[in-house]
């Protein structure tokens, strides 16, 4: 996590009694994610064990001008008139993670090695071979492990894909009295 901010301002009064307060601020916060000692289960044994799933960046800049003026009324009670304006520019960015942190590997589909036939009723030659080696493969049983799909993306925190990586910005302006 890295953060920085800067702010400043000045207050005072004009000769006519109008008080002012001018200020500005800017800042940014960035989170750079890193994962270690984990895998992308859908990539199986070929999975790397550390990932950079992406970053989050938030930044804001604001300028403000506030004024107030106190004047006497005919009722003998002073009235304070306050008014001002504010402008703010802000952005939020989701930075894409590295490819293997969000992509699906071969284990993200049912029967990734083609052990069962297309209609899921009988083993293929490859399936017959693993059965001969001691496997309990049962292609007719939909709960057989060959049909179980594992998670996609780095385990614990899948990375940000291009589909969800973008910079969002907006500006706002306000006046008050």
Predicted features and spans:
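Face-selective signature of the C-terminal outer-membrane beta-barrel domain
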Residues: 1-177
């Amino acid at each position: 996590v890295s953060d920085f901010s800067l702010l400043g301002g000045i207050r005072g009064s004009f000769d006519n009694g109008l008080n002012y307060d001018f200020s500005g601020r800017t800042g940014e916060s960035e989170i750079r994610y890193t994962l270690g000692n984990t895998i992308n289960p859908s990539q199986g044994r070929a999975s790397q064990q550390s990932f950079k799933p992406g970053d989050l960046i938030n930044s804001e800049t604001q300028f403000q001008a506030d004024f107030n003026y106190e004047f006497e009324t005919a009722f003998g009670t002073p009235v304070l008139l306050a008014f001002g304006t504010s402008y703010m520019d802000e952005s939020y960015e989701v930075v894409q993670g590295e490819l293997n942190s969000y992509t699906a590997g071969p284990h993200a589909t049912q029967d990734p090695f083609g052990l069962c036939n297309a209609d899921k009723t009988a083993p293929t030659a490859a399936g017959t071979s693993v059965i001969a080696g001691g496997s309990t493969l049962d292609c007719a049983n939909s709960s057989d492990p060959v049909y179980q799909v594992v998670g996609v993306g780095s385990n614990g925190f899948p990375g940000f894909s291009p589909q969800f990586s973008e910079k969002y910005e907006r500006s706002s302006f306000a006046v008050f009295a």
